[in-house]
Amino acid sequence: DEVYHPIYKLADCQKSTKVFKKGTTTHYEHSEGFEFDLTVSQDSTFMDDWDDFCVVAKEEDRTVLLTSTYPIMSVEVNFYGGISVSEEENKKNLVISHSMPMHISYRNTGFLVELDSTGTPEEMGIEGTVRMLDTITFNGVTYDSVFAIMDMAHYDALNYNEKIESDTAFLYFSKTAGILRLETTDGTSFTIKEGGDNE
């Protein structure tokens, strides 16, 4: 059996998400009544090696951490390389991969979308898991072109998981403002509050 050695790189849109620039701070209001700041404290790109049946791959990944010192909490954003740059694919006329996923997680709630070449979220799997809202207002500020992304616990690539006993959660995401609202499957949430002060 021949072993295949693909190399997967990040797309430009995965590398250049301006809303996750290191040092950027955003103010939020939690559903339990307190306010806090999330700051991009880490932004690292690295090569990850993995293997599967007849495949030994190198994958360029990017991890961004948004952290709060009080309360202590963090949101993790991962971009996984899916643009194949392998010489083997060119020589053997294999299908060229063009996957550009973004995964955002907080505690045990995760959200996964495919990005297009402009960084716009798209559905991965079944319909209804990503909705585009023309406008939505949070804490008195109206945002345009917001994406409502369903949490991963309630669907797989083909079906909704109707027997899940937790709440359906949504991530409200803007390409220009980042995370506007993050809901968890245990019923809590936090929402952007522009002009807020955590001092």
Where are these regions (language model features)?
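Conserved functional acidic sites
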Residues: 1-199
